[in-house]
Amino acid sequence: LQFCKLDPPQRQTAQTKALETLLLVSQDPNWLIRYAAVVGLEALAKIPQLQQPIQTRFAQILATDTEQAICSSRATGSKTRNRRQTTNRKLKPAFVLLLILFVPLSR
């Protein structure tokens, strides 16, 4: 979404609705849905007013979610990780999600 193209009152309403929706979706039983929500929340976390609830949700996810893809996605954004580890990841999370959804796995 390009929030900057909205008038300030509309922008705040749209950002709040996006945040509420993604926080709800981040609790979905399907890990693919949760992963997509984490990617969306990471994008929204660039907005200072939305950072606190997003950080709180990420802490909950790291403490409770057992799916490695979800926790790895969130850990990639952590400032405590080694810079070399994060720069080795060249694929964007949304692109990885598309690969997971559309590329059949060979077993």
UniProtKB/Swiss-Prot annotation:
Does Transport count among this protein's keywords? Answer: no
Q: Which residues form a coiled coil?
A: none
**GO MF entries:** lyase activity
Entry keyword annotation includes NADP: no
Q: Which UniProt keywords apply?
A: Antenna complex, Lyase, Phycobilisome
GO cellular component terms listed in the entry, alphabetical order: phycobilisome
> What's its EC?
4.-.-.-
Summary of the function given for this chain in its UniProt record: Required for the chromophorylation of the CpcA gene product.
**Family statement drawn from the similarity comment of this UniProt entry:** Belongs to the CpcE/RpcE/PecE family.
| Complex formation | CpcE and CpcF associate to form a lyase.
Give the protein's recorded name.
Phycocyanobilin lyase subunit beta
